[in-house]
Design a protein with these regions (language model features):
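Single conserved hydrophobic/aromatic residue that forms the stacking wall/gate
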Residues: 1-5, 9, 181-185
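TPR/TPR-like (Sel1-like) alpha-helical repeat modules
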Residues: 78-91, 159-179
Length: 185
């Protein structure tokens, strides 16, 4: 009976997930993980919880209307990252660890894009200081992502609009050095 109960909780979480009821899926998965923390399928439960936290589904319709992760709720992305990180930390040899690691990389890039999109939003509304601050967050927290080059360019544009031409010139120099460094063999 215990084994059937375990399977029932886990399987109901999957059904909720496939039925686009992420909150119920997460609730069932939390219940499963609390009741059976050392269960052989705990890695799967964590992986499914991470996907449900992002409210992602695999399937034809969801792939056709898939929204960019960076346009979704930033807190949900951070929460999902933490779930995937727990999976990789607790179960590094799990069959789900490579997928969780890939999702973590996607989420870091999405967070960087989210910050950059916010900076662009402020720039378009001529809130140059706010745009500059958001672009600095990208450089500080996500400097190893492909988004950092765009953040530097936006910073240079902000400095120009603020008539801080020395800072703009410095930023353009950094961009040139960064670009040269990246393109050298």
């Amino acid at each position: 009976i215990r084994r059937q109960r375990q399977m029932c909780i886990r399987d109901s979480a999957y059904v909720y997930f496939k039925d686009d009821d992420a909150p119920s899926a997460i609730q069932q998965l939390d219940r499963f993980l609390r009741a059976y923390p050392n269960h052989p399928n705990s890695d799967y439960a964590l992986y499914l919880k991470g996907l449900a936290t992002l409210n992602e589904r695999e399937g034809l319709i969801s792939s056709m209307i898939r929204q960019d992760i960076s346009e979704r709720d930033a807190q949900a992305a951070r929460d999902a990252f933490d779930v995937f990180k727990e999976l990789v930390g607790r179960y590094p040899d799990s069959r789900y660890a490579p997928q969780a690691t890939r999702k973590m990389h996607e989420l870091v890039l999405a967070q960087a894009r989210h910050q950059l999109n916010t900076a662009r939003f402020y720039f378009e509304r001529k809130a140059y200081i706010a745009a500059l601050n958001r672009a600095k967050v990208v450089l500080r927290d996500f400097q190893l992502t492909s988004v950092s080059d765009d953040a530097m360019e936006l910073m240079a544009q902000c400095y120009h609009e603020l008539k801080l031409f020395d800072l703009e010139k410095d930023m353009r120099r950094v961009i040139a050095v960064s670009y040269t460094h990246l393109t050298l063999p």
